[in-house]
């Protein structure tokens, strides 16, 4: 379905709009929060939301400029097994794929990493995360009880962000 509702007030839209380019973002819905969709719309994106059991043909018909793997509940390993065919096809499209929460963990699993349940999940605001490339601390809001296992991370994935609370992986890139 197409999502068009933005947040009520956008402070400085000219910062985000580049020559009126309106990127088409395919959101794969694993339990996405509406506020995330609102922010994508406010960033001048054309947002189409697809269920996790969608076909790659449906996504291709939308002709996205990028894929967004949403947040959502549950064990990422179980979700990856259920969505393995779709995830594999998404990475063959050769367009940017971004994931948060379970979406981030699914990216790791898709490239061979493992996930495990955290002894203490990250819940709420004010989680300090180190941006490794900028060597800066960022304050984040989190809600996850699983993590990508660092020891299983394949060479094709690089850690970009780590938690300053427990050194867990908070960001990766391919």
State what each model feature region is.
Residues 1-62, 74, 86:
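RNA-binding accessory domains that recognize and position tRNA/RNA substrates
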Residues 43, 62, 93-94, 155:
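Structured helix-beta-strand junction loops
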Residues 66, 70-150:
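Cysteine-nucleophile active-site neighborhood
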Residues 136-174:
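Catalytic beta-strand/loop cores that center a nucleophilic Ser/Cys/Thr
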Residues 28, 50, 118, 162, ...:
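Hydrophobic residues at beta-strand termini and immediately following loops
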Residues 20-25, 134-137, 174:
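Beta-strand-turn-beta hairpins that frame and shape the catalytic cleft
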Residues 32-33, 55, 102-103, 144, ...:
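A generic "binding-loop/recognition-motif" signal
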